[in-house]
């Protein structure tokens, strides 16, 4: 394809599984080559702040909004492409925490010995 382009993408890791499935299909259909850097949100923000440039960035909505405000992304190019759920997991045999209300969730989090998140 004579009009094929190389498209540079910066993406946070939340979309990686679906992305790795879809990009080869896109490349085959269009002839374009997609080069992607996957990183966490803070890593992506640092790369952009350090002046790295990309044709497309894929991040959570608030992070994209921050890039728009910083002049690193064009406001009318923002498109929501996915919804993300949040889950709680506990070790096998541990009691299930009460997260049925905002107050119960707050109490559970404050009582936790440790919390891991990504």
Predicted features along the sequence, with ranges:
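N-terminal segment of the mature folded domain
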Residues: 2-116
